[in-house]
Structure formats: structure tokens, C-alpha cells
Amino acid sequence: MKITINQASEFVGKEVTIGAWLANKRSSGKIAFLQLRDGTGFMQGVVVKAEVGDDIFATAKALTQETSLYVTGTINEDTRSPFGYEMAVSGVEVISESHDYPITPKEHGTEFLMDHRHLWLRSNRQHAIMKIRNEIIRASYEFFNKEGFLKIDPPILTGSAPEGTTELFHTKYFDEDAFLSQSGQLYMEAAAMAFGKVFSFGPTFRAEKSKTRRHLIEFWMIEPEMAFYKLEDSLQVQENYVAFLVKAVLDNCRLELDRLGRDVSHLEKMVAPFPRITYTEAIERLHELGFDDIVWGDDFGAPHETAIADSFEKPVFITHYPKAIKPFYMPEDPENDQVVLCADMIAPEGYGEIIGGSERIHDLETLQARMEDFDLDQEAYSWYLDLARYGSVPHSGFGLGLERTVAWISGTEHVRETIPFPRLLNRLYP
């Protein structure tokens, strides 16, 4: 019977066949240990010469790294194995032999591994990170479905963008100018006026010339929008959502977290509610910590976010940023017209902002005035202004960056490892 590695627990004591690749191999005299992977997991196969005969043992010893094969044998429990099971091999059939596999078990530099990203994905570490990424995506759909949100797919090619045009990828749309989407937010606002609570999940593109461990040129975002929600309502959704994601990974990816050496004691503290401080309070705290390079009105850099987050064991909301450093669609605080009703969620352990969100302006005259302040072409945004013309309501939304969230939960240092094929400032290959 053919099974997959993740089904091994159901077949203890039975002879089965697994289609796999040889991740690694070692031999000791008359025993060969095969490290097998099949995409669902990793398992050791033990080949004993006295039990399989000379021919099968010779085949096993001659196997090269990443050769594909069918391995037949009996599944046994093994408490020494991280997986908990191993196979006593009785047969080996080579499907396709691998020659001179470039990523050997020795240490390799980052650029070499990135040049071979199509192969690096096969490694134990990358497998664990991608499984955690998949679980976060799966849990996101579960959370928003349970909360009554409708999945909406905004366009990737747009003629306008919510953040301006300085960091957009330009392309031609037949005889018109078009841009790769930085965010689906404006379209999601339109959808919220039709369906109440909506969310999207898709790629976004930002032509930022940043080379930090937090930045990608192409990344994926979850973007909910909610009609009749004020800022505090949105913050409660955000903290419940992030707590749900962390719990899902703890419940369903414990083996992967162990494989990555992640200290789960940090993650086990991630229960709502999360702390909240205002931008002004954050500036004051930074000054107390000796950060003299920042004044009220400046945006935070990575060191500032890290210093603020270090004061808390959970993600922290920084609310009420200065109006001058936030986008046009954010409404002023009725009690202070110098700040807007917004919040960024900063992850602990130095992982930075993982969510940005705000209330949205729903008054037509206010929205038009703000667009004038930003020198935006109102004709290009006429469809968006229609939302305010025809029965808009108070509404809020946010965007969660998938890769930064994966990096934080998995304990991965650089976001380049949290997406299968990263697009960076200096990398468009493979």
C-alpha cells in the first residue's frame, strides 16, 4: 500500500511503500540510514544488510542526495525520532537519480542559497517555514469565515493607488497607464458598502528601494474592511485575529516550530487584548530611552519600533499618528485635528509593524479636501468618491503583511525565507 509520511502513525507494524526523495544519507558498516522526505514530512528509513540482502543494500548505499525513489518497509514507532516513527526498509526502487546536487549538507552562503531557491525549498528548515505560512493562510480564512466576512478579490492592475504614486510599478494597459496594486483597500471599501464585512488575500507590489530584513518588493496581504466599525471595533478584530493565528500555529505546527528552534513560550502569551499607546506616548517613551534622533511628527524607523515593542510581551498598538505622515483617507481625531484615527500593530522581538489600519473618511467634503491636500486627481478617483456620495457609513479596515507575520511567529530572521520565491531589490531570479 502506498502512503505518505504524514500517514505513518496509521500504519504502525504494517508494510507500506512511500514515494520520496533522499534528503540525506549516512551508513555505518552494514546499516544505512536514509533521511526521506515526501513533501508531507521527513522520516528515517533504516536499511540492514543482513535483512535485505546484498543487492538492495548496495542500491541503498549508492543513493545520491535528492534521488527520487520508492521505499518499501515496515513502519515502527521510534521515540528517538522527532517525527516519532521510522521505516525498517525491505525494498528500494530508484525512480530518477540525482547527480551533483548543489546544496550539500555543508554550510552555504545566503546568495548561493538564494540563487538556488528552487532547490533550497526542499530543505528541512524551508519546509517548516512554508508549513507555518500555509497554516497562517488557512487559519485566516477560518477566522474571517467564522466572523461572517465575505472573500472579495480586488484587481491587481489599477489606474489609481491609495498611497500615491512614488512607490508604484508602472505598466501599459493597452493605451492607458496602469500600476501594479500596492493595496486592494479602496476596492475593499467599495465591497464593504455592498456586503458589510469583507476581506481579501493577494499579492501587493511596492517599488521601495529598501534592503532591510523586513522588506520585500512583492508580498502578500490580508485586507479586511468593515462597515459600521469605528477604530476601537477594528482593533478588537485585529487582536482577536492575530491571537487566533498564533494559537493555530501552536496547535497545528508544533513539530515545525521545534524544527526551527522557536521558543514557544513567547507565543503562548499572545492572547487578547493587546496593549495600546498613542503615537505621542511612544515618542515620549523613546525620549526616555535615549532616542534623541526623533521628534514629534517623524515616522518610526525599525530601531524605534523595536525599542517600543521591547516594553511589552505582546504585540502593541500605536494609535493616533500625526496627520501629515498618514494617507489621505484617514479621518482626523475629533479631539485633536493634528492626528488621525489609525493604529499600527508592532510585533514583539524586533519584527516590526505587521498590521496597519484606520478608520476611513466617509464624508464627501472632508474626503475631497484631503485629496486636495495630497494633490490627488479627483477625476481618477471619481469612483471612490462615489462611495461617499451614495450613503457611506463609518467604516474601518486594516492590512496584515503575511511575510512579516510568518517571520515573527516562526522566529525567522529575514522575510526572504517566508515566501517561496522572494522578490528583493537586487533579485528577480529564480
Swiss-Prot record:
Q: Which UniProt keywords apply?
A: Aminoacyl-tRNA synthetase, ATP-binding, Cytoplasm, Ligase, Nucleotide-binding, Protein biosynthesis
Record's SUPFAM superfamilies? Class II aaRS and biotin synthetases, Nucleic acid-binding proteins
**What GO biological process terms are annotated to this protein in UniProt?**
asparaginyl-tRNA aminoacylation
Protein location: Cytoplasm
The UniProt entry lists the main location of this chain as cytoplasm
Q: List the catalysed reactions.
A: tRNA(Asn) + L-asparagine + ATP = L-asparaginyl-tRNA(Asn) + AMP + diphosphate + H(+)
Task: List the GO terms this entry assigns under cellular component, sorted alphabetically.
Answer: cytoplasm
GO MF annotation terms? asparagine-tRNA ligase activity; ATP binding; catalytic activity, acting on a protein; nucleic acid binding; transferase activity
EC number(s) on record? 6.1.1.22
Q: How does it assemble?
A: Homodimer.
The UniProt family comment states:
Belongs to the class-II aminoacyl-tRNA synthetase family.
Any idea what this protein is called?
Asparagine--tRNA ligase
Origin organism is Listeria monocytogenes serotype 4b (strain F2365)
- Coding gene? asnS
